[in-house]
């Protein structure tokens, strides 16, 4: 019944060309309404879990201590940077940045109090603060004081004094695209300095920009490579035109639908357009190769289309199931990616079996008149290796399968954004400079909270001033000692750079107190007198909440550290906190973007394993239903399983971690492997002849595979490392899928006839 409907549909195209053409044009028109809404989402929100408990803690921390979104401007000069002229120019730059929309404040050397010109006692220091360009200061001495400062060293000046920094605190909105653009525009006008901009709030922005540039530049070159290679295969412009026009229609309609549905492209879904191009070209080649092969046998085009529809349908359905399973994830960008690919594959199927038949009615493609790539492979490899493969495939698999099961267990799950970029790029140099000289990039926050306490006021403690209060909460020596002890232990971790809290301010006060420890009275004085200025209060409120019961230790990770493992780092910090606060009333929470990124990675990894398991089982059931055979279902499932194993093993051997970008490669392996396996199995079981199968379905597989591999070789010239990895490992996956489908699948399928 279903086959008859399919046959009737293809037979009707000849008589209803205008009707079906109108459907395509209507689809293009409707989707065009959403083109302007299609966008890339560069917000940090795309890198967090929607229902993450740690995200709620992170938001609460932002409410209590202010937004933790910031950028860092690293400024260097070919000559001495700490001169009056340079400082005046940098103050001008600071003033311009402060008024940019999205910027809340800028912390720089101009906000750092100089307290040792002259150096006075602790009590007199409250009125002894001076500031660069506001007071007369000895600049070399001021520079050295900042370098030695427990607060400002590696915050606004490097330890060697050659690099100054602006910490640009942002206002907490969702998107900083225009803010980053405006800051970079201001930076370009200060050509006497070497200025690098980096920081967590622009990592996603730059990543998305690299992806955009790669899509435009390498996408165009890849399409050109596809065109040339396909022409060399088909020796006719018309089938090549059909393939690329169909891909263009599919991508245009899909992008329009994404815009209408408000599904933006994020880092997680950045390979969407490339995957859509792959699937579109694959199905088009299978259709045209079938029509061209059958043309030699005087089989009608409508009959050829009817025959190829079923394997294409099941290929599309298995792919849709695979991507639809991502909807079960709790990560919004992953859910959106699943929706995008599911809709894209469906639109690809509909367009391919609507546009291609219409194009063939307009002008059919030429029949094969000479030997092709399948003939070459059959005569120069397949025949010679057939006997060996028949004997060796089982022993080979017995050795190979345990290997590809074991090696992926050594895969690391880590996301080091600095590794995304080429060493010559601005963002890499900025992140490297900040990591080496200015205390690291990605922030971690440790929130420490004290319980309510009844404060007893001693009149003798009020001698400092009328408004003075006794030391309370974190300003008590007992609690401050605990804070300093924990911070000192955390600071010793190699993966962390700058670690900052109110304890750094107390260390500065101790220096002013002739390195004598501070008691409750001195701590109260520091709190109520030394930190009483408006500038000091603005800094203080980012480290202690208004109740003064909760305080924050702020740390930044050295993202360029070769030993960085965020998950292990968080566990190590947790152990330090447990050891110090076990049995006390002090509560602690570890939060910050570093924690949220890690949670996303761990969730991606676990959901990927679940998804792959679900997909492989689904493929097994669907293919078993299609072929009415459990053995065929197992055989087809076997191909993507090995392909995924090979790619993951390669990544393990090359020490390439699974991260936000590379984790989607497994989905590509499954998608392409299933495509090849179903088409080859369908034809092989029907023909029961290896040569005929290779020269028909095998030809389509070889054309598709080598075309995509050739196109992806272009990605090797990208400055964006995930694009390179995507091209390389997609190529490896496709190559192994071809080999396994053509050489191994017939051997496994032969088992059912024995």
Please give the residue ranges for each predicted region:
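Internal alpha-helical transmembrane segments of multipass membrane proteins
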Residues: 212-245, 249-253, 320-325, 607-638, ...
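Transmembrane alpha-helices and their membrane-interface boundaries in multi-pass membrane transporters
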Residues: 260, 277-291, 309-328, 333-374, ...
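Juxtamembrane segments of multi-pass membrane proteins
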Residues: 384-522
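Interfacial helix-loop-helix hairpins and adjacent transmembrane helices
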Residues: 1-25, 350-405, 409, 415, ...
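Transmembrane helices with small-residue packing motifs
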Residues: 21-53, 75, 331-333, 398-431, ...
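Extracytoplasmic
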Residues: 59, 63, 88, 132-237, ...
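Pore- and gate-forming transmembrane helices of large, multi-pass membrane proteins
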Residues: 244, 283, 296-329, 688-719, ...
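Hydrophobic transmembrane alpha-helices and their membrane-interface caps
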Residues: 239-287, 631-681, 713-714, 740-743
């Amino acid at each position: 019944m279903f086959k008859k409907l399919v046959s009737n549909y293809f037979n009707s195209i000849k008589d209803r060309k205008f009707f079906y053409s109108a459907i395509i044009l209507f689809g293009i028109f409707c989707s065009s309404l959403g083109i302007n809404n299609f966008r890339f989402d560069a917000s940090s929100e795309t890198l967090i879990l929607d229902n993450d408990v740690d995200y709620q803690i992170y938001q609460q921390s932002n409410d209590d201590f202010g937004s933790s979104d910031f950028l860092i401007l690293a400024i260097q000069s070919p000559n001495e940077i700490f001169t009056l002229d340079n400082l005046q120019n940098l103050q001008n730059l600071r003033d311009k940045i402060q008024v940019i929309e999205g910027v809340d404040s800028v912390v720089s050397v101009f906000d750092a109090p100089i307290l040792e010109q002259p150096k006075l006692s602790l009590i007199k220091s409250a009125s002894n603060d001076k500031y660069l360009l506001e007071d007369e200061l000895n600049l070399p001495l001021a520079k050295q004081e900042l370098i030695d400062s427990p607060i400002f060293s590696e915050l606004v000046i490097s330890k060697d004094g050659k690099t100054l920094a602006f910490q640009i605190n942002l206002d907490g909105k969702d998107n900083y695209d225009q803010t980053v653009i405006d800051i970079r525009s201001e930076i370009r006008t200060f050509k006497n300095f070497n200025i690098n901009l980096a920081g967590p709030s622009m990592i996603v922005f730059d990543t998305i920009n690299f992806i955009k540039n790669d899509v435009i530049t390498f996408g165009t070159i890849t399409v050109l490579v596809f065109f040339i290679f396909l022409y060399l295969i088909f020796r006719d412009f018309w089938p090549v035109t059909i393939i690329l026009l169909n891909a263009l229609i599919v991508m245009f309609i899909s992008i329009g639908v994404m815009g209408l549905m408000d599904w933006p492209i994020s880092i997680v879904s950045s390979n969407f357009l490339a995957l859509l191009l792959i699937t579109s070209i694959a199905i088009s080649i299978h259709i045209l190769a079938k029509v061209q092969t059958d043309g030699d046998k005087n089989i009608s085009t409508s009959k050829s289309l009817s025959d190829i529809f079923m394997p294409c349908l099941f290929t599309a359905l298995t792919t849709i199931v695979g991507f639809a399973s991502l909807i079960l994830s709790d990560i919004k960008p992953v859910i959106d990616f699943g929706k995008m690919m599911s809709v894209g594959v469906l639109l690809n199927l509909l367009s391919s079996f609507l546009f291609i038949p219409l194009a063939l009615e307009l002008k059919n493609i030429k029949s094969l008149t000479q030997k092709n790539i399948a003939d070459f492979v059959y005569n120069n490899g397949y025949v010679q290796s057939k006997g060996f493969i028949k004997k060796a495939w089982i022993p080979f698999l017995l050795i190979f399968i345990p290997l590809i099961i074991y090696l992926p267990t050594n895969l690391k799950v880590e996301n080091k954004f600095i590794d995304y970029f080429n060493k010559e790029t601005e963002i890499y140099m900025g992140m490297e400079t900040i990591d080496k000289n200015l205390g690291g990039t990605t922030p971690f926050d440790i929130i420490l909270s004290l319980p309510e306490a009844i404060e007893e006021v001693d009149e003798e403690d009020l001698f400092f001033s009328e408004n003075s209060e006794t030391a309370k909460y974190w300003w008590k020596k007992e609690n401050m000692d605990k804070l300093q002890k924990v911070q000192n232990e955390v600071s010793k971790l190699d993966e962390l750079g700058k670690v900052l809290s109110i304890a750094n301010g107390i260390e500065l006060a101790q220096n002013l107190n002739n390195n004598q420890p501070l008691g409750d009275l001195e701590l109260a004085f520091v709190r109520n007198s030394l930190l009483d200025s408006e500038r000091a209060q603005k800094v203080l409120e980012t480290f202690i909440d208004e109740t003064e019961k909760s305080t924050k230790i702020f740390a930044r990770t050295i993202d360029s550290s070769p030993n960085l493992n965020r998950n292990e780092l968080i566990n190590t910090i947790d152990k330090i906190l447990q050891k110090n606060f076990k049995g006390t009333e002090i509560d602690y929470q570890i939060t910050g973007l570093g924690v949220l990124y890690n949670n996303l990675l761990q969730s991606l990894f676990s959901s990927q394993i679940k998804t792959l398991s679900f997909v492989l089982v689904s493929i097994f059931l669907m293919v078993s239903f299609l072929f009415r055979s459990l053995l065929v279902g197992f055989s087809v499932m076997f191909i993507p399983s090995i392909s995924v194993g090979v790619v993951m093993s390669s990544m393990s051997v090359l020490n390439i971690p699974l991260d936000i970008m590379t984790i989607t490669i497994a989905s590509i392996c499954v998608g392409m492997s299933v495509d090849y396996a179903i088409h080859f199995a369908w034809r092989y079981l029907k023909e029961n002849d290896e040569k005929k199968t290779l020269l028909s379905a095998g030809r389509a597989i070889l054309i598709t595979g080598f075309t995509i591999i050739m196109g992806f070789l272009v990605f090797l010239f990208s400055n964006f490392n995930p694009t390179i990895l995507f091209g390389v490992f997609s190529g490896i996956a496709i190559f192994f899928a071809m080999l396994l489908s053509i050489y191994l699948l017939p051997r496994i399928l032969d088992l059912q006839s024995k």
